[in-house]
Amino acid sequence: MKLPLGLLMICLGLTLAKGETNLPPVFTQTLNNIILYENVTVGTVVFRLEAYDPEGSPVTYGAIGADHFSVDPVSGNITLIKPLDREEKDTLKFLVSIRDRVDPEGESERDNVVEVPITFIILDLNDNPPEFQNTPYEADVNEDAAVGTTIFDKITVKDRDIVGESLDLKCLPQQQSPEACRKFRLHIIKRDATILEAAVVLNDTLNYNQRMVYHFQIEATDGPHKTQTTFEARVKDVQDKPPVFQGSLSTVIDEDSPINTLVLTVHARDGDTGEPRKIVYDLRTNPNDYFLLDAQTGELRTAKPLDREALEDSTGIISLVIRARELVNGVPSDDPLTSATAKATVTIRDVNDSPPVFNHKEYSVSLLENTLPGTPLALDMSVSDADVGINSKFALRLDDVSGVFDVEPKLVTGYSQVNIRVANGTLDYENPNQRKFIVLVVAEETDTNPRLSSTATITVSVLDANDNKPVFEQESYSASVSEAALPGQYIATITARDVDSGSYGDSGIRYSLSGTGAELFHVNEQTGVISLANCHDNGESNRRERRDLNEDEHVEEDDGEGHLEMLSMEAATREIGTEPTVQYTLITQAPEEQASSVPLPAPVPHAAPSGVPAATANDDKAPQTCLDYESETTYFLSYKATDDNGRGSASVVSLRISVTDANDSPPVCESPLYRASVDEGAVVFDSPLIVKARDADTMSRISYRIRGSEQVESIFDIDRETGQIIIRPNATLDVTNLNSDQLIFAVEANDGLFTAHCGVNITVRDVNNHVPNFEQQSYSAVVEENSEIGTSVERVHATDLDTGKNAELRYRIQQGSFDDFGIVETTGEVFVSRKLDFDRRNTYQLQIQASDQGTPSLTGTATLTINVQNSNDKDPYFVPATQHAEVRADAPPGQLVYTLIALDPDVANHNALEFAGTDDITAIDKEGKELPHYDQFKEYFKISRNGKVSVNKQLDRNLFAVMRINVLVTDSTAPNVQQGRGLLIIQIIDVNKNPPRFNAPWSVEQPQIKLQMVEEQPVGTVLTTLQANDEDSSIGEFNISDNDYFAINQTSGMIYTIARLDYEVVKEVKFQVTVSDTGVPALTATADVVVDIINLNDNDPKFSQSDYYFNVTENSPRGTVAGKVEAHDGDVGVFGEITYTLIGENNKYFSIDAYTGNVMVANSSILDREQIKELTLSVVAQDKAPAAVQKSATATIHINILDVNDNAPVFTRDVYNSTVAENAAYQPPAALLQVQAIDQDEGLYGDVRYIITAGNEMGLFKLDAQSGIVYPAQSLSGKHGAYELTISARDTQGSGTMESTTKAIITVLRVNRHKPEFVIPALSNATIEIPGDIVQPDYLLLTVRAMDNDTEENGKVSYHLQVNNRNEQQTGEFKIDEVTGELRAKTQLNRKNRANYDIILVARDAGNPPFESLRLLSVSIVDANENRPEFPDASNPYKVSINENSGRDVKIGHIQAASRSKHNRDIFYYMLLGNEDGAFYVDKLTGDIYTNKSLDREETDVYTLYILASIKADLHISEEERASFSIKTLNRDNTVAKVAITVLDVNDNPPVFEKPIYYAGVNANAKMGAAITLVNATDADQGKNAKIEFMIVASNLYKFGATKSTGSIVPSPFAISQDGRISANTIMAEYNQDRFELEIVARELEQPQSSASTKVNIWVFDGTQLVRVILSRPPEEVYQEQEEIIAELRNATQHRIIVDEIRFHLDSIGRIRMDWCDLYFHAVDPQTQQIAPVDEILKDIDRNYDYLKDYYAGFAIENVVPAYIAIVQDEFDLAVAGLVALVIVLFVGVISFIVLCCCLKHWNLSVPVETRRKEALIKKQIIEDLNTTENPLWIEQKLKLYEEQELTMQVFSEPDHISNSEAPGHLDHRSSLEQVHHVGQTVDNTYATIQPRNNQNRLTGGGGAGGGSMRSGGGASAGGVGGAGLLLARVDPHMNEFADYATLRNNRAPSLYEFTGSTFQAPIRDGDDAVAELI
């Protein structure tokens, strides 16, 4: 640098010295070592040259040799023009020049040029990924290599960058070897930023048999960059597998087998199959040293005698551990890799050497004398035999001379509990000989020789029992008493006798009464004296009388001073919509006034008198008695006598007590309030208004008078005798003159002693006779477009001259609002209801209607015109908001790029919108990176005010590839600024020139790439990675041609496998790879890739079958071929050649040809089927590959030994025993036992069938002949005892000669049906609290009690504690008495040690099987000083009951809490929960519970109250506190009592029928007893009060066509059952076509025997009057939707539809379709009440097709057809027929001869027209089995099935005068059937209807055109198009039954009958008497 500067100074000096020399320009900067990073982007200014000229002339800059840079000659900016790469060159040097201008004219040779070198140093960045060297990586490793062994150390990774993080490696597992990275690890040997060396180290043990090859990915990373390669580790096999046992290691040997008996032979082989070693054996365990094992052969033999009973395992199984060891150098090895153990099991087959043994020798038991037969004795007896199998089978019997007892089971195998039962006879304690029995039980073996046995003794003691009931002298008793009788009045004495003694006899009898009203009477329980009970409470000083006068609405109270206070409540409920008004009047009367004055409340406007009338007596001195004749005249009671002091047996007789009458009843209004309505101006009521009162006393006469205002009495009058209210003749009813439209007053009813007041409410109806009138007929208004919702627009008003509701007006908008305006209904104010839009609608014409509330309602209308004023209120907006444009990179400035689009609904001219761009502009380079904001970006494009976007400056795609400009649109006409924003995206399109190129060895001239790959590589193995480059753009993607084996990563170019490569399938794979760049347009290059596949021995031999089954007959000679096995190896060459060998335990009996695979008999001695039925061999197929890679396969050969028939069936047991409960199911039947007989033969000869030959005389059992399972044939309930059946077994499916028999003993036991139910404690989680800090031992905590509804032993309950799932009598702290249930403390319980215990109580019955119930009990020990009151048994709820309708203040129960305080403090009671409706209240001081209102059981039948006991006298419980209470917490709280109140039923509801009227039909052919219909009535009461009976009270007959009844038929032709089923009570044929109207009454069985009535209309029909609906749904679903189907058919036909039957559908071959059904109905004309014709109903259905078609899919209706169709079979005159036939023959003959002569000279050989017609009709196959219908209603989707037939058939026209052009209305579809038509003319009628033949033809007659006639429907028949075929069959004219559909199908009619396209119309002919079913 110093040298050039020196030279420059010398030159400068010389120049100055001359004085006129021009000095050169000078650089002002140092140009050496300028630093640049290699990632500087192209186009960046990297340096700025600066220089000056001493003379001040301008200078220009230049560069020499600068490949990467360009120099701006003016500014001196050095710009990068080519990407930098430090790895290619880290220093760039070139010359820069500076030139001054000596000549002002321009450049000249005299200009000074200075050239100076410049140096750029390129700094490195981490921009290159790591690179693996010397790939691919692979290694071999032995499977026994030690962990830590280095298996490969040649991994080298280099990084061209010198900066960045240190290189690192990572192992990535692959799908085919997920555990590879666990087996191997990467060890770093050397590492820095540029190079890394590593090794692969074994990290876990290997196993060749588990995996032979491992693949994993090695990933190298330098931080941001990653590179991957594949590593393959191949595992080599070594000798490391222990021996493997083969064959079965289980066998059976007899217990008495001699020493040295062969037990089994052990086989094992070396687990390493390459070079297997020899195996030796030894025993590791040998229980009792029973066995010896041969070390060489593996034979296991007995070493000493065996004893099965000496074994610990009762099953007789001995487990041996056998070791197999490999011989290594002739010495057995002990290490785990060369030895193995296995467990062998030897089962010792038992021999008989042990007798049966009882668990005790002696037993004793007691039982009552009334013990029932079959009851088991309470014995713990069991018996067992230590032997097994038949050696353990023994029989039990009794040595019992009395014959009273029996033992079960009779036969036992091994072990059983023994039951001794009372078998027969009745035990009688009074017989001294029956007080004790001694019985001997004998157990003796049955199937052994000798038969071993043992005995046990049972002593049975009989106890006395109460076995006689008290006996009354009469079956029933009766008595009477006056209703005025006083308490204590004697009524009767009734006693009984009992023949038992002591308390079981007369002295122990106790008497009691029960039944409704029993509380009114008292019986002395010892003497039987019956008297009247005291039912009054006389304990209070002041008399408080609550006398029920008309449901307690009138109450009198005596205050103790002789004054009566009468509380009269008046309540009236007005019409719906008004509130009820109630008036209370309290009148105090002195005693002297009570007899004369009658209080009457003054009328209250709009209030009725008493809701329930009050009655007042003139004398209150009547005696107060308990009986009331008017309430109950007779009491039917049960009188019971119970012995044993009321605890024993009982007898009951009926007792009737009659009550005699007394005069004490006041008059009662039949209705508390009478209502009537009358029009103003009327002179009479529409219906007579009569007020009625009744008096229970028959001698009373009631008179009436009106009590009301003067106005009322001036208008109305009443008849004093009848109570009829009339309008006085001179009275005028005018609403305007009345204070109200309701006149309210009372009518007084008086019988001379009592008075009642009946309320009357008369409404005077206004007449609606004025229409509403608007003030204006037209209104107008203006509203702004931007008005808010709810803005008032206009108010309209109308008036009505009527009054009341007739003058109440309601406004509504009829039309014109378009939901933009609404109106206030009551005020008429119109308001904006939705946002207005002038552009959508600017004018509205609203029609407003005002209507009054009268009946009928009158209306008036007016018009409101609303004009909407527009406002500019909407912003302009771009459409779309983001808009896109493209422009080429070489587009010149000024070129139009895009025109922006925006809209504004408020402006009419688009020119009002102005566009502009914003400064918010962003750009993206061609790499996809967003660039920082530069101001010069806005210079490239220009946006005009009209939205035109154009190029403003030359574009540079290297600077940016995409530009995003935020644009703005403004409404220039808006009063305020209205703008819209959008986004314009402009993409710069590049121009591509150079295609990409693959790396070498690929070239354009030689585009082939050859590769190799070993077969059987896992999917995903990388083949190679192709690389490519492009000079002017980047690489876009790689693509591969379609092939089955390889795919390519489109980004990296990595080619990998997608399928398994098999050399045997494909040896070479060819495909093409295409690479494309990212330029526009994209350019590509293609490489042809050829992959050669390298062969491996990778296929195992495969047998053609995994199992082979061969048959060989017994005694086959040596060499007999049993079969052939075949295997195939998919490899090629020696790898695919196979040899065969046999292995296995039985291989010595057979041999195999090593090459052909033929399996032959080698030793026939084992071929004995009775010993061995099947032999199993293993065959091995091996290829001929070297041992290291040799492969094999194994298959199993099953050789079946064929048999001959030589064995009889043998039952597995001589006697089968089964015990079954009496409730065993028999529908479906439950299996009781299964007998089994084994026939050693096979096939048919071994197929056994079973039959019961004896013992089933009662038919209780049935036997499945094939399975041998015995089932109950009927219910076994009540049929206790043992049944012995003899069962026979016969082979050859029951037809053979071999037979054997056995016995089956079935014992039917009583059933233990019920589980015990806890009574105490009652709650499932009960808690008891024990006071005191310390509880002493034996302290009684609780007496547990449970009930079991079973009887005898099944109902006997014992009590236990559950500990660890076992029932115990005691725990560490508690004990329980098993019988009494007393739970006591076992030890001292100290609260300080433990305060709470949880116990599980168990109640268990003694049934078989026993049932038990569990209950959790918590015991809490509380402080004795706690003084809160508690209920003694809070866990057990109080239970009380009360009759419904009982009055208020009735005491129903009492609760009592106790305080633990030493001081007797007061306890107060508060209601907590359960009384939300206020039905009850509790006395705060006493705990008494009272009713607070009358109860109704039908509303609520059970109440549960929670009542708190507290010491606080003023406790207040808020509603929030009540809502927070938890039922679970209250149940555990001892301070809270739970009271369960049951409301008992009173017969206060009458029956109610489900329908007011029923409709039904009955066939005229119905027999007596035929079911017709069912009527249902229900009673809301309960129990016996809900029981009702049905009666037919009238059977009114309406003859056919009559409108009046001929009267009721007696006796009725119908009967009704007690479940409401109506049936025929006579033959119905005589009433054919008549109608009955039955009056049915449902009446209660209990008093007062309320009743209800209904009517049933029954039509007697003929079968031809039914219509059949076919539905593709089961009957049960159709029953559920029956009413909906009827409703739709009724709407369509306008007839009453009556369903007569629903039954299963029969398909085309006569099978029952359980999922389809047919519904039969008849239709009744509602005007004439007669059955409508079938064709009329079908016409109605046709006409309503559009209405019904929407319903048929939902109801699944497939077809609607007549149930029957009548066909006439006319008489046939043979003589006339013969004459007609002769004339026709002669006529046809003459005509034919003439025609023949005329046509001879015009002979033309062609196919006759008639032949073509017949083919058209006959050759077309008819589709028969279609679910179409004869109604066009159901054919909408089924036309195409007949399309071919419709388009091809020819139809004969009928009369000549009918043509295709005639209208459908000119054809009579029915009557045309009776016409006779000529045949001979044919027409083309595509949619013709084929009708049945004329009535002169027979179905069996000839076919063809001459056999009958057809008529043309002209395309206009009533039926429409398509439809199902109609098949008709002739039947016997005297029969009336269904046709056989199968016969119709098999004996088909000619083709003329096979198609119809119309609705079926039943022919109407005189004399029709033949019936056929329409299918």
UniProtKB/Swiss-Prot annotation:
Q: Which residues lie on this side of the membrane: Cytoplasmic?
A: 1797-1975
Just give the chief location class: membrane
Q: Which residues constitute the signal peptide according to the record?
A: 1-17
Q: Which GO terms describe its cellular component?
A: plasma membrane
- By its UniProt entry, which InterPro entries does this protein fall under? Cadherin-like_dom, Cadherin-like_sf, Cadherin_CS
SMART domains with a match to the protein in the record: CA
Q: Where is the composition biased (Polar residues)?
A: 1887-1899
Q: Which CDD domains match?
A: Cadherin_repeat
GO MF terms on file?
Answer: calcium ion binding
Q: Can you tell me which residues are glycosylated?
A: 39, 77, 203, 424, 730, 761, 1039, 1049, 1111, 1163, 1217, 1325, 1349, 1492, 1576, 1691
Instruction: List compositional bias (Basic and acidic residues) regions by residue number.
Output: 537-549
Query: Domain Cadherin spans what residues?
Result: 28-132, 133-245, 246-358, 359-472, 473-669, 670-774, 775-878, 879-998, 999-1103, 1104-1211, 1212-1318, 1319-1431, 1432-1553, 1554-1677
> Which cell locations does it reside in?
Cell membrane
- Spell out the protein name for this chain: Cadherin-87A
